[in-house]
Amino acid sequence: MLVRFQSRAHNYLDNILMKQSINKHHISSEEIIWTDKNALWYAEEYGDHISNDLTINNIGLNPNDILLDIGCGTGAAVKIASRICHQGKIYGVDPIETMINIALKNRDKPSNIKFILGSAENIPLDNKSVNKVIAINSIHHWKDYKKGLLEVHRVLKSKGLFFISNDIVNNKDCGHGPGPLHTNTDIMNELKKTGFIDITLQDYTLDNDGIHLIECKKEK
């Protein structure tokens, strides 16, 4: 039975927020002071968290997929994805320049990954340009999640898939505190409002970690 799965990254985030006197229940990633030192330390300690593997290995990636990772951070997830999606194209978008710089240094060479400084609310890609989108522990940090969901819908091709992955905490919620996206049901309701269909939820676990993985589809 699952008792408690807690990402180490959440503990580190709490430490940063306490030092900066920021309310973690009302925070976007841009509000954290991501100094080079903080970002480098985060990359070393938490960049390869198992949630990346659990997500990438359960979204049915194909060699020729065109994948977008929103809030890619240090690029750990897309680096894993590139070894499966080796004939396609992968985009990693993050609003933190230091994270993008670390991701660029860490990617395999040669690589089919393109890292872009940007946000969920203004994805720097064309309409209907990707067929899979992932957001791993990032949707709760979007400044305007409703606008972000509309942007995901815009860049997805017809029948494209969107996956939202969050760490399992206390068996029931997403571990990000009170807010409009506190539970999986909240997230799934917002996806439905945005026009996504075939919305499902599946949990995946490995050792002492696990994820909630929500999948949905753009109809056309």
Residue ranges and their predicted role:
Residues K146-S158:
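A short glycine-rich, Lys/Arg-flanked "PGG" loop and its adjoining helix->strand segment in the class I
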Residues L68-I70, T74-N122:
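Class I SAM-dependent methyltransferase SAM/SAH-binding core
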Residues I66, G160-L161:
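Short glycine-centered segments of the SAM/dcSAM-binding site in methyltransferase folds
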Residues E121-K132:
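A short acidic, Gly/Pro-enriched loop at the edge of an enzyme's catalytic core
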Residues D203-K220:
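Core SAM-dependent methyltransferase catalytic element
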Residues A9-G60, A76-I80, M99, N106, F163-D186, ...:
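Conserved class I S-adenosyl-L-methionine
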Residues K132-D144:
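A short SAM/SAH-binding and catalytic strip from SAM-dependent methyltransferases
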